[in-house]
């Protein structure tokens, strides 16, 4: 006699939390800012914004969803901006090309991390 077996459905849950979203690089010549998740969990970009020094230009990063651990998002600007792979186009005008400009990443809690370009 065979005993029937049942298998409960498997639920895979992706944990999205604060993660550890950071600015990894700001390249004023290439007009690129690289944002990445340095944490061990998926990090939602909801509530994160990126702006230049003086806040003349600002972008809501939440529109790009979330980042897996070690995943990057390259925010491109300028005439040669492109959206391939992990790259997204912010603007087709130069943002970071002036001397002494700074990329500022604002977290949902209002804390800021900045990196000179």
What does each model-identified segment do?
Residues 1-117:
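Activation on beta-sandwich/Ig-like modules and their edge loops
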């Amino acid at each position: 006699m065979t005993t029937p077996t049942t298998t409960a459905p498997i639920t895979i849950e992706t944990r999205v939390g604060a993660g550890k979203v950071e600015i990894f690089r700001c390249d004023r010549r290439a007009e690129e800012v690289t944002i990445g998740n340095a944490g061990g969990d998926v990090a939602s970009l909801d509530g994160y914004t990126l702006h230049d020094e003086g806040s003349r230009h600002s972008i809501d990063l939440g529109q790009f969803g979330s980042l897996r651990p070690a995943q990057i998002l390259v925010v491109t600007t300028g005439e040669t901006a492109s959206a391939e792979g992990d790259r997204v186009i912010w603007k087709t005008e130069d943002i970071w090309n002036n001397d002494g400009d700074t990329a500022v990443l604002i977290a949902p809690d209002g804390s800021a991390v900045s990196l000179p370009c």
